[in-house]
């Protein structure tokens, strides 16, 4: 199963260097957001994609993300950090894996 990343240029470049299978860059123009929606729909329908990493800001602009079991769609912070804040991320991790993250 492939790991795919979608996001801004800096985030995508970092994941390319880390060895993700496929990476797609988008800016925040209306045309680019529409392309991102179409690419996400295409990726969700593919059988070879296991994880889609998408920056929080791009996911927010796209709107409703598909609710599917596979591939797993994970929202990740970009170079500016999380738009949801640290507390919400802790809560999400606690619910997902049952472990609370503390500093």
UniProtKB/Swiss-Prot annotation:
It comes from the Archaea. It is a peripheral membrane protein. The keyword Glycosyltransferase does not apply. InterPro entries: ATPase_V1-cplx_f_g_su, ATPase_V1-cplx_fsu_bac/arc, ATPase_V1_fsu_sf. One of its GO terms (cellular component) is plasma membrane. One of its GO terms (biological process) is proton motive force-driven plasma membrane ATP synthesis. One of its GO terms (molecular function) is proton-transporting ATPase activity, rotational mechanism. Pfam families: ATP-synt_F. It is found in: Cell membrane. Component of the A-type ATP synthase that produces ATP from ADP in the presence of a proton gradient across the membrane. Has multiple subunits with at least A(3), B(3), C, D, E, F, H, I and proteolipid K(x). HAMAP family: ATP_synth_F_arch (MF_00312). This is A-type ATP synthase subunit F. The lineage of its organism: Archaea, Methanobacteriati, Methanobacteriota, Thermococci, Thermococcales. The gene is atpF.
